[in-house]
UniProtKB/Swiss-Prot annotation:
Principal cellular location given in the protein's record: cytoplasm
InterPro entries: Aa-tRNA-synt_II, aa-tRNA-synth_II, aa-tRNA-synth_II/BPL/LPL, Asp-tRNA-ligase_1, Asp-tRNA-ligase_1_N, Asp/Asn-tRNA-synth_IIb, AspRS_core, GAD-like_sf
Subcellular location: Cytoplasm
Name of the protein this chain belongs to: Aspartate--tRNA ligase
One BP term from GO: aspartyl-tRNA aminoacylation
Listed GO CC annotations: cytoplasm
Keyword NAD annotated: no
Family from the record: Belongs to the class-II aminoacyl-tRNA synthetase family. Type 1 subfamily.
EC numbers for this chain: 6.1.1.12
Taxonomic lineage of the native organism: Bacteria, Pseudomonadati, Pseudomonadota, Gammaproteobacteria, Pasteurellales
Region (Aspartate): 196-199
Enzyme category, top tier: ligase
Pfam families with a match to the protein in the record: GAD, tRNA-synt_2, tRNA_anti-codon
Reactions that this protein is recorded to catalyse: tRNA(Asp) + L-aspartate + ATP = L-aspartyl-tRNA(Asp) + AMP + diphosphate
């Protein structure tokens, strides 16, 4: 027997028992007559000690290094009262070593567990980094989340059904990872960006409640919360309304937070996309932050200040203000930094006004734009924003998208900088009623979610007549500013699906080539269906309290989509490429 107990499970009830432990040497203290070691496994740490009276054991112990892998056999004894360590779960006991087996000693480590290592070092030696307590706890939490989800789904009648990994490239918003076919030379499979079409086909097959915890792949630029391969909790249902799907999934997340964090998230508020963008400048608003954007175009549309009046009177313009309580203490340097920050989002400047004394009229206002705005305008601004003495107002005026993005980002930054965002709170919500389409950089229409999302209360002819005004029957779950899940009611009418493809500029030939199987399937008694997908990585990131998604994935990629440990991606063997009928235009190094 290699192990009788996990290290972290030993306690006073085991005193007097003989135990066999297997794990790693965490720390070593040589006190001359005794050598004390902390032995670690996935469940925790326990202290063991060697007595010099046993020369053989003592000699072995003196040659061990940190992170050596060992087996310890010994007797559990109670610590003296003065030696109890309340900071250790096993701090009331220790193990007198009676035998030791060294599975493998360790060389000098390339990581220092007692200090912060660079992320590059951590990813290169990931197998060592995962031995750290925090990382081990993150992965254990992830495993418990997936176990919880499987139990919940099983209890609610869902079937876990696998869908293909090698599939057909379809336009879903990001670039595909392609896999060449050896048998069908010149042809490629695509790794799925999501199981979207397959889960809809399962609904057409009669499996009315499907779920899968599944790997997905997107070849896109990475961020702190994005990876080229990620894991979804994928869900699809038939004969349920959007409201019923949301209720079912809200209950799952509510129950998960209770299970993992003992936190009651309460009832999730529902907010329209328009409301979220208007008040928070984001379709995933962080409601822990009390700051809100206030539109003032009607107040400033007639002022003799082109920076304000032009966007205030433009169809695609927006003028808004962000009130920051007690913000008048901000220095000019800080304000300049915020001006540079909004420029990242295309803003040409950042007007501001400090409210020093409301009762003093214009003399109580400090602002570089005060000369363009009279007392009547400022009084209207103060009334609408409920500004108080000591506040500062930041103004955004430009095209709607620029102002919304810039002021939304500024809201978040100021919330963090001035500690206005409650880091201890949990603020979930649903965002609904998204636009069905948006315009890309060239003015063409694209699907805001994906082209299989149904519109709200429109016939195909009505949708075709004015697509830009169409509202999608879509919904996103947002927690603390992160989109943790998103879904929609799907199109189940072949005419509606063809109408959407036409609006997106997909001609009939491409429709048949890329989606012919779907259009055919829609003709044979397709049920109404709706679904949702959660990002497992992002959920785990929130529950564990980390801000880096790589901390909740065992072997993640860098922001350059590379694995530093295995050195993937790598060049392929020329002979293999020849078998695949592939020729590269890049010379191998």
């Amino acid at each position: 027997m290699m192990r009788s107990h996990y290290c972290g499970t030993l306690n006073r009830s085991h005193v007097g028992q003989a135990v066999t432990l297997s794990g790693w040497v965490h720390r070593i203290r040589n006190l001359g007559r005794f050598i004390f070691m902390q032995i670690r496994d996935r469940e925790g740490i326990v202290q063991v000690f060697f007595d010099e009276k046993d020369d053989t054991l003592f000699k072995v112990a003196s040659q061990l290094r940190a992170e050596a892998c060992v087996q310890i056999q010994g007797q559990v004894i109670a610590r003296d009262e003065a030696q109890i360590n309340p900071e250790m779960a096993t701090g009331e006991i220790e193990v007198l070593v009676q035998n030791v087996l060294v599975y493998n000693n360790a060389e000098v480590l390339p990581l220092d567990f007692n200090q912060n290592n660079t992320e590059e070092q951590r990813l290169k030696y990931r197998y060592l980094d995962l031995r750290r307590h925090k990382m081990a706890e993150n992965l254990k939490t992830r495993a418990k989340i997936t176990s919880f989800v499987r139990r919940y789904m099983d209890e609610h009648g869902f079937l876990d059904i696998e869908t293909p990994m090698l599939t057909k490239a379809t336009p879903e918003g990001a670039r595909d990872y392609l896999v060449p076919s050896r048998v069908h030379k010149g042809k490629f499979y695509a790794l799925p960006q999501s199981p979207q079409l397959f889960k809809q086909l399962l609904m057409m097959s009669g499996f009315d409640r499907y779920y899968q915890i599944v790997k997905c792949f997107r070849d896109e630029d990475l961020r702190a919360d994005r990876q080229p391969e990620f894991t979804q909790i994928d869900v699809e249902t038939s004969f349920l309304t959007a409201e019923e799907v949301r209720a079912l999934m809200e209950n799952m997340i509510h129950s998960l937070w209770l299970d993992r964090l003992n936190v009651d998230l309460g009832k999730f508020p529902i907010m329209s996309w328009q409301e979220a963008m208007q008040h928070f400048g984001s379709d995933k608003p962080d409601l822990r932050n009390p700051l809100e954007l206030v539109d003032i175009a009607d107040i400033v549309k007639n002022v003799e200040f082109n920076v304000f009046n032009e966007p205030a009177n433009a169809i695609d313009g927006r003028v808004t203000v962000l009130r920051v309580p007690n913000g008048a203490t901000l220095t000019r340097k800080q304000i300049d930094e915020y001006t540079q920050f909004v420029a990242i989002y295309g803003a040409k400047g950042l007007a501001w006004a400090k409210i020093n004394d409301i009762n003093a009229g214009m003399d109580g206002i400090q602002s570089p734009v005060a000369k363009f705005l009279n007392a009547e305008i400022f009084n209207a601004l103060i009334e609408r924003t409920a500004a108080q003495n000591g506040d500062i107002l930041f103004f955004g005026a430009d095209k709607w998208q620029v102002v919304t993005d810039a002021m939304g980002a500024l809201r978040l930054k100021i919330g963090r900088d001035l500690a206005l965002t409650d880091q201890t709170a949990w603020k979930p919500l649903w965002v609904i009623d998204f636009p069905m389409f948006e315009r890309d950089g060239e003015g063409n229409l694209s699907a805001m979610h994906h082209p299989f999302t149904a519109p709200k209360d429109l016939s195909p002819d009505q949708l075709a007549a004015d697509p830009i005004k169409a509202v999608a029957n879509a919904y996103d779950m947002v927690i603390n500013g992160y989109e943790v899940g998103g879904g929609s009611v799907r199109i189940f009418d072949p005419k509606m699906q063809q109408t959407v493809f036409n609006i997106l500029g997909i001609n009939e030939q491409d429709q048949q080539e890329k989606f012919g199987f779907l259009l055919d399937a829609l003709k044979f008694g397709t049920p109404p269906h709706a679904g949702l997908a959660f990002g497992l990585d992002r959920l785990t990131m929130l529950i564990t309290g980390t801000e880096n998604i790589r901390d909740v994935i065992a072997f993640p990629k860098t922001t350059a989509a590379a694995c530093l440990m295995t050195e993937a991606p790598s060049y392929a063997n020329p002979q293999v490429l020849q078998e695949l009928a592939i020729q590269t235009t890049v010379e191998t190094e």
